[in-house]
Amino acid sequence: MTKSELILRLAERNPHLYQRDVEKIVTTIFDEITDALARGDRVELRGFGAFSVKKRDARLGRNPRTGETVDVNQKFIPFFKTGKQLRERLNTD
């Protein structure tokens, strides 16, 4: 599901809301999650999961084309851990 499909689906399920308003809401939610992660905060949505940032240390890597050793700088990556309710819903028969 893409962001556009999510917006359309939410607008269909909530006919009292205009699609442009739903788009603003979804965009604001994504922006707030992104801003929190950029600050190093953890975003927990109970039952759904938690977003956090993990640090990858600098390391030596290898260019697969040339085999040359290269330095890979440290970086921060987003991480998502599913919540218990989401896992249970996905694994029901």
UniProtKB/Swiss-Prot annotation:
Membership in a protein family: Belongs to the bacterial histone-like protein family.
Coiled coil, from the record: none
UniProt keyword annotation of Repeat present: no
Assembly description: Heterodimer of an alpha and a beta chain.
Biological process annotations from GO: DNA recombination; regulation of DNA-templated transcription; regulation of translation
UniProt-recorded name of the protein: Integration host factor subunit beta
Any single Gene Ontology cellular-component annotation: cytosol
Lineage: Bacteria, Pseudomonadati, Pseudomonadota, Alphaproteobacteria, Rhodospirillales
GO MF term list: DNA binding; structural constituent of chromatin
One Pfam entry name: Bac_DNA_binding
Gene3D superfamilies: IHF-like DNA-binding proteins (4.10.520.10)
Keyword annotations from UniProtKB, A to Z: DNA recombination, DNA-binding, Transcription, Transcription regulation, Translation regulation
Protein role: This protein is one of the two subunits of integration host factor, a specific DNA-binding protein that functions in genetic recombination as well as in transcriptional and translational control.
